[in-house]
Amino acid sequence: PAFGFFSDNFRDTIKRTLVAGHRRESQHPANDFANILTANVGKVGPAHFTQPQQAIQYVECHDNATVFDYFQLEKEEIRLEERKALSRLALHLVLLAQGVPFIHAGQEFYRTKGLEENTYNLPDNLNQLDWTSLSKCKEEIAFLKELIAYRKSQPLLRLRKGQEIRDYCDLKWLSDHHFIYTIEKDRKKITILVNIGDQEMTYHQPNDSQLLFAYPQAKLQTSIPKGKELSLSAHSWILLYEGD
């Protein structure tokens, strides 16, 4: 349990599912969405890891195409705004999942390597970080900082034991395009609604709660009464909290 492993199952399942825009069935439990978001410790079927510290959750690292480029390569007709939204969603899911998050430099400002998949032997103009992108992505970066800070402060997003994850986490698909991911422990509950489709969805929250995250807004603390209808735009997510 002291060693971590880059979770290719997380990487591939997230990217392929977001490209498809709908739920994808797999014969391998390690690729099940309920498992990849819960560090693959056996929420559904056999465990791939024994403890969450073993699961390095990522969608981008030094090899292969950047996430931003991946969506263009896989979906040539993709619009820029959709490409950005999918890239954000992939990155945010890394931070919402159990396990150890790994963020590659430049993901927060849609890093591109000119659609090249492997650039180890290519010049600096492809491998360098374009720092001018920072000024163009202030909203995305500010939101990401708040999400990272919230993850660090919220134990429910950082459960330490595999058994805790199996006991307290749950994921259900509401349709082929939407799922609800919950973590509930000691009268505290996080509900994360995710829309991977290209159409807006609505959801009725069954309990009184607080809306904390709804991109591009963070730390909202908006009271949501029981039964209120919530709208969730395409390729986005929201986080609700119940408890003290």
Predicted regions span which residues?
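Conserved alpha/beta catalytic core and glycan-binding cleft of carbohydrate-active enzymes
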Residues: 1-110, 116, 120, 169, ...
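Carbohydrate-interacting/catalytic domains
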Residues: 81-84, 95-103, 107-109, 113-244
